[in-house]
Amino acid sequence: MKLTKVALFSLGLFGFSSMALAHGDHMHNHDTKMDTMSKDMMSMEKIVVPVQQLDPQNGNKDVGTVEITESAYGLVFTPKLHDLAHGLHGFHIHEKPSCEPKEKDGKLVAGLGAGGHWDPKQTQKHGYPWSDDAHMGDLPALFVMHDGSATTPVLAPRLKKLAEVKGHSLMIHAGGDNHSDHPAPLGGGGPRMACGVIK
C-alpha cells in the first residue's frame, strides 16, 4: 500500500514537472516570437516623403512619394514617382525642411528654400554616397524610365537611422550627377526639379 502511494506521488511529481517544463518551453517560444515580431516591427518603420514637381509660377504638382527605410547596409530610398523627365537625375538630401522658392539675384528660384546639400561635417565637397569626405546628403542618382516613372531604390551606406534625415528635404535635380565638383560644381546637375520635406 505504501509503495502504491509512493508510486502515485512520484507519478504526480513527474506529471507536474512535465507540465512546468512544457509551460516553460511555451513561454520561451512565446518570448522568442515576441522578439521576432518586435524586430519585424522595427524593420517595417519608414518615412514616406510626399514629392512635388516644382513650378513657382503655376503651382507645384504631386508626383508621388519616396519611402525611406532602414536596412543592415544603410538607409534605402524607394521612389514611387511618376510624370518626371526620363533619364538620370541628381538626387540629394538638402539641409533645410523646405521646398519653397526664394529669390536669388532678383529671380525666383524653385526649391531654393531647401538650402544646399546636407553637409553636417562641413566637407564642402560633393562626392559619392560612400565617400567619407563628401556631403552626407549625396545619394546615388535617380533613374526615371521612359514612361516618367521612377521605382528603383537607391542605398545610402553612410546613413543608418531614420532620425538622421528627419528635418531635411529630398531634392531631385534636372540632369545627371557625376559625384564630383569637376568639371562643374555639385555633380553638374541642373535646376531643382522636384522636392519633398522629410518629416
Swiss-Prot record:
Key words of the record: Antioxidant, Copper, Disulfide bond, Metal-binding, Oxidoreductase, Periplasm, Signal, Zinc
Q: Where does Cu cation bind?
A: H92, H94, H117, H173
Q: Listed GO cellular component terms?
A: periplasmic space
Names of required cofactors: Cu cation; Zn(2+)
Where on this chain does Zn(2+) bind? H117, H126, H135, D138
Q: Which CDD domains would you find in this protein's record?
A: Cu-Zn_Superoxide_Dismutase
Record-given protein name:
Superoxide dismutase [Cu-Zn]
PANTHER family assigned: SUPEROXIDE DISMUTASE CU-ZN -RELATED (PTHR10003)
Cellular compartment(s): Periplasm
Q: Which Pfam families did the record assign? A: Sod_Cu
Provide the GO MF annotations for this entry. Answer: copper ion binding; superoxide dismutase activity
Regarding protein family, the annotation reads: Belongs to the Cu-Zn superoxide dismutase family.
Q: What is its EC number?
A: 1.15.1.1
Q: What does this protein do?
A: Destroys radicals which are normally produced within the cells and which are toxic to biological systems. May play a role in the interactive biology of organisms with their hosts and so contribute to their capacity to cause disease.
Is the keyword Cell cycle in the record? no
Q: What class of enzyme is it?
A: oxidoreductase
Q: Which gene encodes it?
A: sodC
Q: Which domain of life, per UniProt?
A: Bacteria
Q: List the Gene3D superfamilies hit by this protein, alphabetically.
A: Superoxide dismutase, copper/zinc binding domain
